[in-house]
Amino acid sequence: MVVTIPQLQQWKRSGRAIAVLTAWDWLWASLLDQAGVDLILVGDSLAMVALGHKNTLPLSLDEMLHHTRAVCRGVQRALVVCDLPFGSYQESPQQAVRSASRVLKETPAQAVKLEGGYPAMVETVTHLVRAGIPVLGHVGLTPQSVHQYGGYPQQGKSVEAAERILSEAIALEQAGAFAIILEHIPADLGLTITQKLSIPTIGIGAGPHCDGQVLVTADALGLSERQPPFAKAYANLRETILQAVQEYCNEVQTHQFPGSG
């Protein structure tokens, strides 16, 4: 069954949780799709996990399009969403429509994601949805604002901050977002937002009560050197890969591989 936006929204109503992971190329996308991931996010986190940048800000729209095309070639079932990178949508709703239109025209992705729920961004989401472009919202910790935060601290800890994030989520739903990512907020706030919205919430460090969960695949598989505090590693692939490559190098260097036969 091919996953669609209406299907995700039906799953919220039925209580079936949504599994989301990130991918940045054909290989990872094909593995995630075969494993049953519901939504594959071509996240701008690829700037860090695939391209070696210190944060997500250097990534360009052309680079996102390149990686999204590669991801889509590996997907048969999952819904694919492309992150709009920093600087490709904040200037105006018109800029956002141009950038998002390129995503839908130049890749097979079905939707875009952007960060923020402040009034200007809500207006942008309204324009995108009116243009027929599905939007995945994102509130709480928004990594493209890393320099404003001075890092990646939890958001929504004060009453005022929690009320603001809740208001942003409601405004994004009213603007037409089909789902919203809640990142690095207290679990009780994640529950409140999930109960208030009729669209799915996808949590990352937002507690167990969201309608779905997302992790960066490098974190979920134990490839990252440093894990976020809310991530869970389901494997230790970093160590497995290091050991395998070291064994290969040793066998080549000592003339054990390929054998004499």
From Swiss-Prot:
Record GO cellular component, one term: cytoplasm
Cofactor(s) named in the record: Mg(2+)
Protein residues bound to Mg(2+): 44, 83, 115
Molecular function terms, GO-annotated: 3-methyl-2-oxobutanoate hydroxymethyltransferase activity; magnesium ion binding
Keywords, in A-Z order: Cytoplasm, Magnesium, Metal-binding, Pantothenate biosynthesis, Transferase
GO biological process, one term: pantothenate biosynthetic process
One protein family per Pfam: Pantoate_transf
Co-factor binding details: Binds 1 Mg(2+) ion per subunit.
Compartment(s) where it occurs, according to its Swiss-Prot or TrEMBL record: Cytoplasm
Residues annotated as catalytic: 183 (proton acceptor)
EC number, as in UniProt: 2.1.2.11
Catalytic activity: 3-methyl-2-oxobutanoate + (6R)-5,10-methylene-5,6,7,8-tetrahydrofolate + H2O = 2-dehydropantoate + (6S)-5,6,7,8-tetrahydrofolate
First-level EC class: transferase
Pathway per the UniProt entry: Cofactor biosynthesis; (R)-pantothenate biosynthesis; (R)-pantoate from 3-methyl-2-oxobutanoate: step 1/2
Positions of disulphide bridges: none
Location (main, coarse): cytoplasm
The family this protein is said to belong to: Belongs to the PanB family.
Function noted in UniProt: Catalyzes the reversible reaction in which hydroxymethyl group from 5,10-methylenetetrahydrofolate is transferred onto alpha-ketoisovalerate to form ketopantoate.
Name the record gives this protein: 3-methyl-2-oxobutanoate hydroxymethyltransferase
Provenance organism: Cyanothece sp. (strain PCC 7425 / ATCC 29141)
Gene name as annotated: panB
